[in-house]
Protein backbone atom coordinates (compact mmCIF):
# COMPACT_ATOMS: atom_id res chain seq x y z
CA UNK A 1 0.00 0.00 0.00
CA UNK A 2 2.82 2.41 0.74
CA UNK A 3 4.34 1.89 -2.74
CA UNK A 4 1.03 2.73 -4.48
CA UNK A 5 0.55 5.91 -2.50
CA UNK A 6 4.10 7.13 -3.30
CA UNK A 7 3.69 6.47 -7.07
CA UNK A 8 0.48 8.51 -7.37
CA UNK A 9 1.98 11.88 -6.25
CA UNK A 10 4.95 11.35 -8.59
CA UNK A 11 2.66 10.72 -11.58
CA UNK A 12 0.46 13.72 -10.72
CA UNK A 13 3.45 16.06 -10.43
CA UNK A 14 4.86 14.78 -13.75
CA UNK A 15 1.56 15.27 -15.55
CA UNK A 16 1.27 18.80 -14.13
CA UNK A 17 4.79 19.68 -15.37
CA UNK A 18 4.07 18.27 -18.81
CA UNK A 19 0.83 20.20 -19.05
CA UNK A 20 2.50 23.42 -17.99
CA UNK A 21 5.25 23.00 -20.60
CA UNK A 22 2.78 22.11 -23.33
CA UNK A 23 0.61 25.09 -22.44
CA UNK A 24 3.53 27.52 -22.45
CA UNK A 25 4.80 26.11 -25.75
CA UNK A 26 1.37 26.39 -27.35
CA UNK A 27 1.08 30.03 -26.22
CA UNK A 28 4.51 30.82 -27.66
CA UNK A 29 3.59 29.14 -30.95
CA UNK A 30 0.33 31.06 -31.15
CA UNK A 31 2.08 34.37 -30.48
CA UNK A 32 4.78 33.57 -33.06
CA UNK A 33 2.19 32.59 -35.66
CA UNK A 34 0.22 35.77 -35.01
CA UNK A 35 3.32 37.95 -35.37
CA UNK A 36 4.44 36.15 -38.52
CA UNK A 37 1.17 36.15 -40.44
CA UNK A 38 -0.55 39.30 -39.15
CA UNK A 39 2.29 41.75 -38.43
CA UNK A 40 5.24 40.85 -40.63
CA UNK A 41 4.99 40.76 -44.41
CA UNK A 42 6.41 38.34 -46.91
CA UNK A 43 10.02 38.80 -47.94
CA UNK A 44 10.68 39.84 -51.53
CA UNK A 45 11.82 36.86 -53.62
CA UNK A 46 15.53 36.85 -54.44
CA UNK A 47 16.96 36.32 -57.89
CA UNK A 48 17.86 32.70 -57.19
CA UNK A 49 14.41 31.98 -55.85
CA UNK A 50 12.80 33.59 -58.88
CA UNK A 51 15.01 31.52 -61.21
CA UNK A 52 14.02 28.38 -59.31
CA UNK A 53 10.37 29.27 -59.73
CA UNK A 54 10.87 29.76 -63.48
CA UNK A 55 12.58 26.36 -63.90
CA UNK A 56 10.04 24.36 -61.87
CA UNK A 57 6.98 23.75 -64.10
CA UNK A 58 5.16 21.53 -61.60
CA UNK A 59 4.85 24.16 -58.87
CA UNK A 60 1.23 25.04 -58.08
CA UNK A 61 -0.06 28.47 -57.18
CA UNK A 62 -3.26 29.32 -55.42
CA UNK A 63 -5.59 32.16 -56.28
CA UNK A 64 -5.51 33.64 -52.77
CA UNK A 65 -1.72 33.89 -52.66
CA UNK A 66 -1.70 35.25 -56.23
CA UNK A 67 -4.13 38.01 -55.32
CA UNK A 68 -2.09 38.80 -52.24
CA UNK A 69 1.09 39.01 -54.34
CA UNK A 70 -0.60 41.39 -56.78
CA UNK A 71 -1.80 43.60 -53.95
CA UNK A 72 1.60 43.78 -52.30
CA UNK A 73 3.26 44.41 -55.65
CA UNK A 74 0.92 47.32 -56.38
CA UNK A 75 1.80 48.89 -53.01
CA UNK A 76 5.53 48.18 -52.84
CA UNK A 77 6.74 48.27 -56.42
CA UNK A 78 5.62 51.82 -57.29
CA UNK A 79 7.97 54.01 -59.31
CA UNK A 80 10.01 56.48 -57.27
CA UNK A 81 8.46 59.41 -59.16
CA UNK A 82 5.02 58.50 -57.79
CA UNK A 83 6.09 58.41 -54.14
CA UNK A 84 5.64 62.15 -53.64
CA UNK A 85 2.04 63.17 -54.03
CA UNK A 86 1.43 65.87 -56.63
CA UNK A 87 0.60 69.32 -55.34
CA UNK A 88 -2.83 70.42 -56.55
CA UNK A 89 -2.84 73.59 -58.59
CA UNK A 90 -5.53 75.09 -56.36
CA UNK A 91 -3.20 75.08 -53.35
CA UNK A 92 -0.64 77.34 -55.08
CA UNK A 93 -3.19 79.70 -56.56
CA UNK A 94 -3.16 83.23 -55.15
CA UNK A 95 -6.89 83.22 -54.52
CA UNK A 96 -6.62 79.99 -52.56
CA UNK A 97 -3.74 81.36 -50.48
CA UNK A 98 -5.63 84.56 -49.71
CA UNK A 99 -8.77 82.64 -48.83
CA UNK A 100 -6.97 80.23 -46.48
CA UNK A 101 -5.08 83.06 -44.76
CA UNK A 102 -8.21 85.25 -44.44
CA UNK A 103 -6.66 88.10 -46.44
CA UNK A 104 -8.66 90.19 -48.89
CA UNK A 105 -6.79 91.70 -51.83
CA UNK A 106 -7.96 93.16 -55.11
CA UNK A 107 -6.45 91.93 -58.40
CA UNK A 108 -4.11 94.05 -60.45
CA UNK A 109 -5.57 96.55 -62.91
CA UNK A 110 -3.26 96.67 -65.92
CA UNK A 111 -2.92 99.85 -67.94
CA UNK A 112 -0.88 100.66 -71.02
CA UNK A 113 0.81 103.75 -69.63
CA UNK A 114 4.57 103.30 -70.09
CA UNK A 115 3.96 99.56 -70.29
CA UNK A 116 3.36 99.39 -66.53
CA UNK A 117 0.49 98.17 -64.42
CA UNK A 118 -1.22 100.05 -61.65
CA UNK A 119 -2.36 97.68 -58.92
CA UNK A 120 -5.34 98.35 -56.71
CA UNK A 121 -4.41 98.29 -53.06
CA UNK A 122 -5.86 95.54 -50.93
CA UNK A 123 -8.94 96.11 -48.83
CA UNK A 124 -7.21 94.46 -45.87
CA UNK A 125 -6.12 96.74 -43.06
CA UNK A 126 -2.44 97.75 -43.54
CA UNK A 127 0.08 96.29 -41.12
CA UNK A 128 2.24 98.40 -38.82
CA UNK A 129 5.38 96.19 -39.07
CA UNK A 130 6.71 97.21 -35.66
CA UNK A 131 8.09 93.72 -35.07
CA UNK A 132 9.73 93.75 -38.50
CA UNK A 133 11.44 97.06 -37.73
CA UNK A 134 12.97 95.56 -34.58
CA UNK A 135 14.34 92.55 -36.49
CA UNK A 136 15.77 94.71 -39.28
CA UNK A 137 17.34 97.07 -36.74
CA UNK A 138 19.02 94.16 -34.96
CA UNK A 139 20.34 92.82 -38.26
CA UNK A 140 21.75 96.18 -39.35
CA UNK A 141 23.30 96.76 -35.93
CA UNK A 142 25.00 93.37 -36.11
CA UNK A 143 26.34 94.15 -39.59
CA UNK A 144 27.76 97.45 -38.35
CA UNK A 145 29.43 95.79 -35.40
CA UNK A 146 30.86 93.01 -37.58
CA UNK A 147 32.19 95.58 -40.06
CA UNK A 148 33.96 97.40 -37.24
CA UNK A 149 35.45 94.17 -35.89
CA UNK A 150 36.75 93.26 -39.35
CA UNK A 151 38.28 96.69 -39.99
CA UNK A 152 41.83 95.28 -39.71
CA UNK A 153 41.19 92.20 -41.82
CA UNK A 154 43.14 92.33 -45.12
CA UNK A 155 40.46 90.45 -47.07
CA UNK A 156 37.11 91.00 -45.32
CA UNK A 157 37.43 94.70 -44.52
CA UNK A 158 34.77 97.03 -45.87
CA UNK A 159 37.50 99.54 -46.67
CA UNK A 160 39.38 97.07 -48.85
CA UNK A 161 36.16 96.02 -50.59
CA UNK A 162 35.23 99.60 -51.42
CA UNK A 163 38.75 100.42 -52.58
CA UNK A 164 38.77 97.38 -54.87
CA UNK A 165 35.37 98.28 -56.31
CA UNK A 166 36.17 101.94 -56.88
CA UNK A 167 39.56 101.19 -58.46
CA UNK A 168 38.29 98.55 -60.86
CA UNK A 169 40.43 99.12 -64.00
CA UNK A 170 37.64 97.91 -66.30
CA UNK A 171 35.23 100.63 -65.15
CA UNK A 172 37.42 103.49 -63.99
CA UNK A 173 38.33 106.02 -66.73
CA UNK A 174 41.96 106.66 -67.54
CA UNK A 175 41.78 110.33 -66.51
CA UNK A 176 40.98 109.40 -62.89
CA UNK A 177 43.85 108.43 -60.62
CA UNK A 178 43.64 105.92 -57.78
CA UNK A 179 40.67 106.56 -55.50
CA UNK A 180 41.37 106.61 -51.77
CA UNK A 181 38.56 106.16 -49.25
CA UNK A 182 39.14 108.64 -46.43
CA UNK A 183 35.95 108.33 -44.38
CA UNK A 184 33.20 105.73 -44.01
CA UNK A 185 30.16 106.11 -41.80
CA UNK A 186 27.62 103.30 -41.63
CA UNK A 187 25.07 105.48 -39.87
CA UNK A 188 23.31 105.39 -36.54
CA UNK A 189 19.61 105.28 -37.39
CA UNK A 190 17.51 102.43 -38.78
CA UNK A 191 14.91 102.29 -41.56
CA UNK A 192 11.28 102.34 -40.51
CA UNK A 193 8.84 100.14 -42.43
CA UNK A 194 5.09 100.76 -42.25
CA UNK A 195 1.80 100.47 -44.10
CA UNK A 196 2.32 96.96 -45.45
CA UNK A 197 -0.29 95.64 -47.88
CA UNK A 198 -0.48 92.61 -50.17
CA UNK A 199 -1.67 92.71 -53.77
CA UNK A 200 -2.14 90.06 -56.44
CA UNK A 201 -0.31 90.62 -59.72
CA UNK A 202 -0.32 88.69 -62.95
CA UNK A 203 2.76 86.62 -63.71
CA UNK A 204 3.00 84.59 -66.95
CA UNK A 205 5.61 82.27 -65.42
CA UNK A 206 3.30 81.05 -62.65
CA UNK A 207 -0.23 79.71 -62.80
CA UNK A 208 -2.70 82.02 -61.12
CA UNK A 209 -0.28 84.93 -60.70
CA UNK A 210 1.72 85.73 -57.61
CA UNK A 211 1.45 87.89 -54.52
CA UNK A 212 3.45 91.03 -53.89
CA UNK A 213 3.91 92.90 -50.62
CA UNK A 214 4.17 96.69 -50.67
CA UNK A 215 5.53 98.56 -47.68
CA UNK A 216 6.58 102.15 -47.08
CA UNK A 217 10.15 102.70 -45.91
CA UNK A 218 11.67 105.86 -44.47
CA UNK A 219 15.27 106.50 -43.41
CA UNK A 220 16.69 109.76 -42.04
CA UNK A 221 20.34 109.49 -41.08
CA UNK A 222 22.94 112.24 -41.47
CA UNK A 223 25.77 109.90 -40.49
CA UNK A 224 25.49 107.61 -43.51
CA UNK A 225 28.30 108.99 -45.65
CA UNK A 226 31.33 108.18 -47.78
CA UNK A 227 34.32 110.45 -48.44
CA UNK A 228 36.98 109.85 -51.09
CA UNK A 229 40.03 111.56 -52.53
CA UNK A 230 41.44 111.26 -56.04
CA UNK A 231 43.21 113.18 -58.79
CA UNK A 232 42.00 114.16 -62.23
CA UNK A 233 44.89 113.42 -64.58
CA UNK A 234 45.64 115.33 -67.79
CA UNK A 235 47.24 112.85 -70.20
CA UNK A 236 47.90 115.27 -73.07
CA UNK A 237 50.39 115.85 -74.63
CA UNK A 238 52.00 113.19 -72.43
CA UNK A 239 50.73 111.01 -69.58
CA UNK A 240 50.40 112.76 -66.24
CA UNK A 241 51.02 116.20 -67.66
CA UNK A 242 49.01 117.75 -64.82
CA UNK A 243 46.86 116.59 -61.93
CA UNK A 244 43.91 118.20 -60.18
CA UNK A 245 43.23 117.01 -56.60
CA UNK A 246 39.57 116.33 -55.86
CA UNK A 247 37.90 115.45 -52.54
CA UNK A 248 34.25 114.40 -52.38
CA UNK A 249 31.90 113.58 -49.53
CA UNK A 250 28.45 112.08 -50.18
CA UNK A 251 25.88 111.73 -47.39
CA UNK A 252 22.38 110.27 -47.52
CA UNK A 253 20.18 112.82 -45.79
CA UNK A 254 16.86 111.05 -46.27
CA UNK A 255 15.41 108.18 -48.24
CA UNK A 256 11.74 107.29 -48.55
CA UNK A 257 9.88 105.09 -50.96
CA UNK A 258 7.71 102.03 -51.44
CA UNK A 259 9.41 98.65 -51.27
CA UNK A 260 7.99 95.76 -53.32
CA UNK A 261 8.75 92.21 -52.17
CA UNK A 262 7.66 89.00 -53.85
CA UNK A 263 8.74 85.38 -54.05
CA UNK A 264 9.80 84.05 -57.44
CA UNK A 265 9.11 80.35 -58.15
CA UNK A 266 12.09 78.04 -58.25
CA UNK A 267 13.21 77.96 -61.88
CA UNK A 268 16.76 77.86 -63.19
CA UNK A 269 16.20 80.85 -65.51
CA UNK A 270 14.36 83.15 -63.12
CA UNK A 271 17.18 85.52 -62.27
CA UNK A 272 18.43 85.87 -65.83
CA UNK A 273 14.93 86.42 -67.15
CA UNK A 274 14.15 89.13 -64.62
CA UNK A 275 17.48 90.85 -65.13
CA UNK A 276 17.65 90.84 -68.93
CA UNK A 277 14.09 90.51 -70.18
CA UNK A 278 13.24 93.26 -72.71
CA UNK A 279 9.76 93.61 -71.27
CA UNK A 280 11.21 94.64 -67.92
CA UNK A 281 13.09 97.64 -69.33
CA UNK A 282 11.32 100.94 -68.89
CA UNK A 283 11.33 103.07 -72.07
CA UNK A 284 11.37 106.25 -69.98
CA UNK A 285 14.64 105.20 -68.39
CA UNK A 286 16.07 104.37 -71.80
CA UNK A 287 15.36 107.86 -73.10
CA UNK A 288 16.71 109.52 -69.96
CA UNK A 289 20.31 109.29 -71.15
CA UNK A 290 22.14 112.37 -70.06
CA UNK A 291 25.62 111.24 -71.08
CA UNK A 292 25.14 109.96 -74.63
CA UNK A 293 26.78 106.88 -76.06
CA UNK A 294 29.25 106.45 -73.22
CA UNK A 295 26.43 106.23 -70.68
CA UNK A 296 24.61 103.64 -72.77
CA UNK A 297 27.80 101.61 -73.05
CA UNK A 298 28.31 101.76 -69.31
CA UNK A 299 24.74 100.65 -68.70
CA UNK A 300 25.13 97.68 -71.02
CA UNK A 301 28.37 96.76 -69.29
CA UNK A 302 26.72 97.01 -65.86
CA UNK A 303 23.82 94.84 -66.97
CA UNK A 304 26.30 92.26 -68.24
CA UNK A 305 28.14 92.36 -64.93
CA UNK A 306 24.84 91.97 -63.07
CA UNK A 307 23.95 88.94 -65.15
CA UNK A 308 27.35 87.37 -64.54
CA UNK A 309 27.06 88.00 -60.81
CA UNK A 310 23.60 86.42 -60.79
CA UNK A 311 24.87 83.36 -62.61
CA UNK A 312 27.80 83.08 -60.21
CA UNK A 313 25.41 83.39 -57.28
CA UNK A 314 23.26 80.57 -58.63
CA UNK A 315 26.25 78.40 -59.60
CA UNK A 316 26.15 76.62 -56.26
CA UNK A 317 22.68 75.24 -56.92
CA UNK A 318 24.08 72.75 -59.51
CA UNK A 319 20.91 72.95 -61.55
CA UNK A 320 18.54 72.58 -58.59
CA UNK A 321 15.83 75.28 -58.74
CA UNK A 322 15.59 77.54 -55.71
CA UNK A 323 12.89 79.90 -54.59
CA UNK A 324 14.17 83.47 -54.84
CA UNK A 325 13.23 86.74 -53.19
CA UNK A 326 12.72 89.66 -55.58
CA UNK A 327 12.63 93.21 -54.25
CA UNK A 328 12.51 96.64 -55.86
CA UNK A 329 11.28 100.19 -55.25
CA UNK A 330 8.50 102.05 -56.99
CA UNK A 331 9.56 105.01 -59.17
CA UNK A 332 8.02 107.54 -56.76
CA UNK A 333 10.92 107.27 -54.30
CA UNK A 334 12.77 110.18 -52.70
CA UNK A 335 16.54 110.23 -52.27
CA UNK A 336 18.06 113.38 -50.76
CA UNK A 337 21.85 113.58 -50.90
CA UNK A 338 24.35 116.04 -49.48
CA UNK A 339 27.42 116.37 -51.70
CA UNK A 340 30.44 118.39 -50.61
CA UNK A 341 33.44 118.90 -52.85
CA UNK A 342 36.91 120.39 -52.65
CA UNK A 343 38.82 120.91 -55.91
CA UNK A 344 42.30 122.30 -56.39
CA UNK A 345 45.79 122.23 -54.95
CA UNK A 346 46.80 125.76 -53.97
CA UNK A 347 43.65 127.74 -54.70
CA UNK A 348 40.71 125.47 -53.97
CA UNK A 349 37.04 125.55 -54.82
CA UNK A 350 34.55 124.36 -52.24
CA UNK A 351 31.09 122.90 -52.82
CA UNK A 352 30.90 123.47 -56.57
CA UNK A 353 27.20 123.18 -57.56
CA UNK A 354 27.96 121.53 -60.90
CA UNK A 355 29.98 118.80 -59.22
CA UNK A 356 27.14 118.17 -56.76
CA UNK A 357 24.66 117.88 -59.64
CA UNK A 358 26.87 115.41 -61.51
CA UNK A 359 27.39 113.25 -58.43
CA UNK A 360 23.69 113.26 -57.53
CA UNK A 361 22.71 112.37 -61.10
CA UNK A 362 25.19 109.50 -61.16
CA UNK A 363 23.99 108.12 -57.82
CA UNK A 364 20.36 108.40 -58.92
CA UNK A 365 21.13 106.60 -62.19
CA UNK A 366 23.06 103.88 -60.37
CA UNK A 367 20.12 103.34 -58.00
CA UNK A 368 17.48 103.31 -60.74
CA UNK A 369 19.38 100.87 -62.91
CA UNK A 370 19.38 98.28 -60.13
CA UNK A 371 16.42 98.39 -57.76
CA UNK A 372 13.77 100.70 -59.25
CA UNK A 373 10.82 99.24 -61.13
CA UNK A 374 10.74 97.55 -63.59
CA UNK A 375 14.21 96.34 -62.58
CA UNK A 376 14.40 94.06 -59.55
CA UNK A 377 17.06 92.42 -57.44
CA UNK A 378 16.70 88.64 -57.16
CA UNK A 379 18.27 86.86 -54.19
CA UNK A 380 18.22 83.07 -53.86
CA UNK A 381 16.88 82.01 -50.48
CA UNK A 382 19.05 79.60 -48.48
CA UNK A 383 17.83 76.24 -47.30
CA UNK A 384 16.13 76.26 -43.90
CA UNK A 385 16.21 72.50 -43.30
CA UNK A 386 17.75 71.87 -39.84
CA UNK A 387 21.37 70.74 -40.09
CA UNK A 388 23.94 69.88 -37.46
CA UNK A 389 26.45 72.16 -39.17
CA UNK A 390 24.29 75.16 -38.25
CA UNK A 391 23.39 74.05 -34.74
CA UNK A 392 24.38 76.28 -31.83
CA UNK A 393 23.72 76.52 -28.10
CA UNK A 394 22.02 79.69 -26.87
CA UNK A 395 23.64 81.31 -23.85
CA UNK A 396 27.01 79.57 -24.06
CA UNK A 397 29.91 81.94 -23.47
CA UNK A 398 32.43 80.36 -25.81
CA UNK A 399 31.04 79.32 -29.18
CA UNK A 400 33.14 77.43 -31.68
CA UNK A 401 32.55 77.72 -35.39
CA UNK A 402 30.69 74.60 -36.57
CA UNK A 403 30.88 73.75 -40.23
CA UNK A 404 32.48 77.03 -41.39
CA UNK A 405 36.20 77.49 -41.98
CA UNK A 406 36.16 80.86 -43.74
CA UNK A 407 35.84 82.89 -40.54
CA UNK A 408 38.80 81.34 -38.74
CA UNK A 409 40.45 84.71 -38.13
CA UNK A 410 37.39 86.26 -36.47
CA UNK A 411 36.66 85.82 -32.79
CA UNK A 412 33.36 83.99 -32.50
CA UNK A 413 32.68 85.41 -29.06
CA UNK A 414 32.42 88.87 -30.65
CA UNK A 415 30.47 88.16 -33.82
CA UNK A 416 28.19 85.28 -32.80
CA UNK A 417 24.68 86.32 -31.85
CA UNK A 418 24.17 83.10 -29.93
CA UNK A 419 27.03 83.45 -27.45
CA UNK A 420 26.82 85.75 -24.45
CA UNK A 421 29.72 88.14 -23.97
CA UNK A 422 31.52 88.43 -20.68
CA UNK A 423 31.47 91.52 -18.49
CA UNK A 424 34.84 92.83 -19.67
CA UNK A 425 33.85 92.57 -23.34
CA UNK A 426 30.57 94.33 -22.65
CA UNK A 427 32.35 97.19 -20.92
CA UNK A 428 34.82 97.63 -23.78
CA UNK A 429 32.04 97.48 -26.38
CA UNK A 430 29.98 100.04 -24.47
CA UNK A 431 32.94 102.42 -24.28
CA UNK A 432 33.72 101.90 -27.93
CA UNK A 433 30.11 102.42 -29.02
CA UNK A 434 29.93 105.62 -26.99
CA UNK A 435 33.03 106.98 -28.72
CA UNK A 436 32.51 105.62 -32.22
CA UNK A 437 29.83 108.17 -33.23
CA UNK A 438 28.41 106.49 -36.28
CA UNK A 439 31.14 103.89 -36.84
CA UNK A 440 33.47 106.21 -38.72
CA UNK A 441 36.54 104.45 -40.05
CA UNK A 442 39.49 106.65 -40.88
CA UNK A 443 42.98 106.06 -42.09
CA UNK A 444 45.72 106.80 -39.63
CA UNK A 445 47.47 109.97 -40.71
CA UNK A 446 50.75 108.84 -39.21
CA UNK A 447 53.19 107.94 -42.03
CA UNK A 448 55.05 105.49 -39.80
CA UNK A 449 52.07 103.25 -39.16
CA UNK A 450 53.10 99.70 -39.88
CA UNK A 451 49.64 98.32 -40.49
CA UNK A 452 48.38 101.26 -42.57
CA UNK A 453 44.84 100.07 -41.96
CA UNK A 454 41.78 101.70 -40.51
CA UNK A 455 42.22 102.97 -36.99
CA UNK A 456 40.02 104.82 -34.58
CA UNK A 457 41.41 107.25 -32.05
CA UNK A 458 39.13 109.26 -29.75
CA UNK A 459 41.70 112.05 -29.47
CA UNK A 460 41.99 112.38 -33.22
CA UNK A 461 38.22 112.23 -33.54
CA UNK A 462 37.76 115.03 -31.01
CA UNK A 463 40.34 117.20 -32.76
CA UNK A 464 38.66 116.64 -36.12
CA UNK A 465 35.24 117.47 -34.71
CA UNK A 466 36.62 120.63 -33.16
CA UNK A 467 38.13 121.59 -36.51
CA UNK A 468 34.83 120.89 -38.26
CA UNK A 469 32.98 123.10 -35.77
CA UNK A 470 35.49 125.88 -36.31
CA UNK A 471 35.30 125.51 -40.10
CA UNK A 472 31.79 124.51 -41.28
CA UNK A 473 33.06 124.02 -44.84
CA UNK A 474 35.57 121.35 -43.93
CA UNK A 475 34.88 117.89 -45.36
CA UNK A 476 35.71 114.81 -43.28
CA UNK A 477 38.84 113.37 -44.83
CA UNK A 478 39.37 116.29 -47.20
CA UNK A 479 42.59 118.02 -48.10
CA UNK A 480 44.02 120.28 -45.35
CA UNK A 481 44.61 124.03 -45.34
CA UNK A 482 41.67 125.35 -47.29
CA UNK A 483 42.49 128.54 -49.18
CA UNK A 484 39.50 130.57 -50.39
CA UNK A 485 39.46 131.74 -53.96
CA UNK A 486 40.19 135.46 -54.36
Swiss-Prot record:
GO annotation terms (biological process): mitochondrial genome maintenance; mitochondrion-endoplasmic reticulum membrane tethering; phospholipid transport; protein insertion into mitochondrial outer membrane
Gene Ontology CC: endoplasmic reticulum membrane; ERMES complex
Membrane topology according to the record: Single-pass type I membrane protein
Coiled-coil stretches noted in the UniProt entry, renumbered to this chain: none
GO molecular function: lipid binding
Domain SMP-LTD: 125-382
Residue spans of biased composition, Basic and acidic residues class: 70-79, 429-440, 462-473
Topology, Cytoplasmic side: 41-486
UniProt biased composition (Basic residues): 51-61
Record's keyword annotation contains Membrane: yes
Feature: compositional bias, Polar residues: 80-96, 269-291, 307-318, 401-412
Annotated compartments: Endoplasmic reticulum membrane
Topological domains, Lumenal: 1-19
Segments of this protein annotated with the region Disordered: 45-98, 269-318, 393-412, 420-486
Transmembrane parts of this sequence: 20-40
The keyword Heme appears for this protein: no
Annotated Pfam families: MMM1
Complex formation: Homodimer. Component of the ER-mitochondria encounter structure (ERMES) or MDM complex, composed of MMM1, MDM10, MDM12 and MDM34. A MMM1 homodimer associates with one molecule of MDM12 on each side in a pairwise head-to-tail manner, and the SMP-LTD domains of MMM1 and MDM12 generate a continuous hydrophobic tunnel for phospholipid trafficking.
Domain-level remarks: The SMP-LTD domain is a barrel-like domain that can bind various types of glycerophospholipids in its interior and mediate their transfer between two adjacent bilayers.
Function description: Component of the ERMES/MDM complex, which serves as a molecular tether to connect the endoplasmic reticulum (ER) and mitochondria. Components of this complex are involved in the control of mitochondrial shape and protein biogenesis, and function in nonvesicular lipid trafficking between the ER and mitochondria. The MDM12-MMM1 subcomplex functions in the major beta-barrel assembly pathway that is responsible for biogenesis of all outer membrane beta-barrel proteins, and acts in a late step after the SAM complex.
Family (UniProt): Belongs to the MMM1 family.
Protein name per Swiss-Prot or TrEMBL: Maintenance of mitochondrial morphology protein 1
Lineage, opening ranks: Eukaryota, Fungi, Dikarya, Ascomycota, Pezizomycotina
